[in-house]
A protein has these predicted regions:
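Helix-turn-helix DNA-binding motif, specifically the short coil turn and the N-cap/start of the second
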Residues: 69
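Charged, amphipathic alpha-helical coiled-coil/dimerization segments
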Residues: 60, 78-138, 145
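Short capping segments at the starts of secondary-structure elements
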Residues: 53-58
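N-terminal leader segment of winged-helix/HTH proteins
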Residues: 1-37
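Short alpha-helical "packing" element that flanks the helix-turn-helix/winged-helix DNA-binding module
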Residues: 46-47
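The alpha-helix within a helix-turn-helix
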Residues: 63
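C-terminal regulatory/oligomerization modules of transcriptional regulators
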Residues: 1-7, 130-151
C-alpha cells in the first residue's frame, strides 16, 4: 500500500481484522467450557437464545437473531426437541409460525450453561473497566448499524 497510514487507521485495521479471529477464539473457549454438557456446539446458541428470550420466540425470529437460514435451524431444533430440551407450539395468531419454549430439562440446562458462561466472561473480560466494555459494545453497535444500512 502506497498510502501512509496514521495511527487511527492502523488501529481501525487491527480492530476489523481481529473481529473474526476474536469470534473464533471466543467460540473455542466457550466450547471448551461447555463441552462436558453433552450438547453440540451448534445446538448451544439456539438453546441459549430461546432461554434468553423468555420463551415463546418465533422460529423465524430466532433464525434472524442467529444469522441462520431456516432449514439449518430446523435441523438443530429437531435435535433439541428430540432431546426434550425444547418444544414447538403453533402460534395462535399465525398457524404457519412456530413458537419455541424450553422444557423443564431445557431450563435446567440453560441455567447451568449460563452460569458457566458468566464465569468464563469474568475470566476473559474481568480486567476490562466499565468504560472499556462500553467502548467495545459501541464498536459492535456501529458495525451492526453500518451492516443494516449497507445490506
Amino acid at each position: 500500500m502506497d498510502r501512509p497510514l496514521d495511527e487511527r487507521t492502523v488501529l481501525q485495521m487491527q480492530l476489523s481484522s481481529g473481529l473474526l479471529y476474536a469470534g473464533r477464539q471466543w467460540q473455542r473457549l466457550a466450547d471448551s467450557r461447555l463441552g462436558s454438557y453433552g450438547i453440540s456446539t451448534a445446538c448451544t446458541m439456539p438453546l441459549l437464545m430461546i432461554g434468553r428470550s423468555g420463551g415463546g420466540i418465533r422460529q423465524v425470529a430466532l433464525a434472524q437473531q442467529l444469522g441462520m437460514e431456516g432449514p439449518s435451524l430446523v435441523r438443530l431444533l429437531d435435535k433439541l426437541c428430540a432431546s426434550d430440551l425444547v418444544r414447538r407450539e403453533s402460534d395462535a395468531s399465525d398457524r404457519r409460525a412456530n413458537l419455541l419454549w424450553l422444557t423443564e430439562a431445557g431450563h435446567a440446562l440453560v441455567q447451568e450453561l449460563e452460569d458457566q458462561l458468566i464465569d468464563l466472561r469474568q475470566d476473559v473480560f474481568g480486567a476490562l473497566s466499565m468504560d472499556e466494555l462500553h467502548a467495545v459494545l459501541k464498536a459492535w453497535r456501529l458495525l451492526a448499524e453500518a451492516a443494516d444500512r449497507i445490506t
